[in-house]
């Protein structure tokens, strides 16, 4: 029964991510307090993640909600940050021919949104989805691929906009974040890496990339 409940909550979290844009920008919230939609969405993710961790036996370890291996956490995070910055610099020069940072007046909003999004998406895919796939008995390699593809599908708007670079990048990010999570035993490096990827794009190419309110 506990496993069935955990699976149901996991499915709900995945569906929640697929419908996140409509939820966070719902007219129901926009006519009241604009920030209420995103806050409600992120709060739901955290609450359901905690619920699944409580339901599962040894849920925190199973879902990588621990500090992880101290010897590997910091090096993995630093590697993630370096790769994120190099990738953003390469994109800025190859696509725009120069470094074009995000205007400073937009930075506080983007900073907060990037942090919240990194925590929420890593909880959904690297903690819950990956953890549940491994709990179900799938091999590590297969579980990493499945959660990365699901993560890419969650960014289907990139497909509609023909943003192939970012669509492929979302799958690669999903796999890399999953690998970092499994390697360290903690979802924290994936959260830091995800945040670093987003902020690197803002820092080096944010002025030209299409920005939407978070």
PLM feature spans:
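Juxtamembrane helix-loop-helix connectors linking adjacent transmembrane helices
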Residues: 25-36, 53-123, 130-131, 135-136, ...
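Structural signature of hydrophobic alpha-helical transmembrane segments
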Residues: 2-13, 76-82, 132-146, 179
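Transmembrane helix-loop-helix hairpins at the membrane interface
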Residues: 89-93, 103-214
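Intrinsic disorder/low-structure terminal segments
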Residues: 41, 47, 72, 77-79, ...
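N-terminal, membrane-interfacial amphipathic/helix-forming hydrophobic leader that caps
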Residues: 1-65, 142, 202-214
């Amino acid at each position: 029964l506990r496993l069935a409940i955990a699976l149901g909550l996991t499915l709900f979290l995945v569906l929640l991510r697929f419908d996140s844009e409509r939820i966070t920008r719902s007219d129901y919230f926009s006519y009241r307090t604009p920030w209420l939609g995103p806050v409600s969405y992120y709060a739901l993710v955290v609450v359901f993640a905690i619920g699944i961790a409580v339901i599962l036996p040894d849920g925190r370890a199973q879902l990588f909600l621990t500090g992880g291996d101290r010897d590997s956490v910091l090096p993995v995070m630093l590697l993630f940050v370096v790769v994120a910055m190099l990738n953003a610099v390469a994109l800025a020069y190859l696509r725009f021919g120069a470094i074009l940072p995000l205007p400073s007046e937009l930075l506080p909003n983007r900073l907060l949104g990037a942090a919240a999004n990194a925590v929420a998406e890593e909880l959904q895919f690297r903690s819950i989805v990956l953890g549940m796939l491994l709990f179900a008995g799938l091999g590590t390699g297969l579980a990493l691929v499945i959660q990365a593809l699901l993560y890419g599908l969650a960014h289907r708007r990139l497909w509609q906009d023909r943003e192939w670079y970012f669509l492929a990048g979302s799958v690669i990010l999903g796999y890399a974040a999953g690998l970092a999570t499994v390697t360290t035993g903690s979802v924290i490096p994936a959260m830091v890496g995800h945040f670093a990827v987003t902020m690197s794009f803002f820092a080096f190419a944010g002025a030209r990339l299409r920005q939407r309110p978070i």
